[in-house]
Amino acid sequence: MKIIVVKNASELGKQAFDLLAKAVDEGAKTLGLATGSSPVELYQEIVASQLDFSQMTSVNLDEYVGLSPENPQSYHYFMNQHLFQYKPFKRSYLPDGQTKDIQAECGRYNQILAENPVDLQVLGIGQNGHIAFNEPGTPFDSVTHEVALTESTIKANARFFNSIDEVPKSAICMGIANIMAAKEIVLLAKGESKAKAIKDMVEGPVTTDVPASVLQKHPNVTVIADQAAASLLK
């Protein structure tokens, strides 16, 4: 696991962009993409660049159950706003949050991942060490599955909705085994609130209590953290 500590979020975006551009340059066909605040600066760098994804495929980690792609809180909407409207891919896949058959959708998404092996996967990390919506306790051999959102996640998301009743109660999410199948992983972390998770991921035991700790077993992981997020590392 390679650790790069940077001064601020804009440096983090630049470092992540350099790794992604190198992968594209070396012939990457499929990029694994993330949502949330962690990759925003990376996407800004991509939008400002000459990178061309028109012959490439993207796959996203997750989507809320029950939200349409037009819903501003959906991850489809987030990706369009931050990246796809400026830099379209030949094909972009996200789980279908409006599916009537969640098990079938998980199977469909596993098939997509099998047919489009990820060359570089972008990840963030949660304060409790989760990757995507894989919360503590998720088995390391998990594949795409429905995840019931924790009470704390629902409360944290409530500010984006008119009422807490509108907040999705579950999400469809790539499993840890799907994430580990990527050839290369770049994990981004910003802010003091992520410092303990980064320390546990890098220095702690490999345990399902800290889902991100499984990345210690991956042969090609780069962690890019700002000084606050890296502040507890030895």
UniProtKB/Swiss-Prot annotation:
GO biological process assignments: carbohydrate metabolic process; glucosamine catabolic process; N-acetylglucosamine catabolic process; N-acetylneuraminate catabolic process
Example of a GO MF term: identical protein binding
Keyword Glycosyltransferase: no
Pathway annotation: Amino-sugar metabolism; N-acetylneuraminate degradation; D-fructose 6-phosphate from N-acetylneuraminate: step 5/5
UniProt-listed CDD domains: GlcN6P_deaminase
Record's keyword annotation contains Repressor: no
Enzyme Commission number: 3.5.99.6
GO cellular component, one term: cytoplasm
Coiled-coil residue windows: none
Source organism, top-level taxon: Bacteria
Full protein name: Glucosamine-6-phosphate deaminase
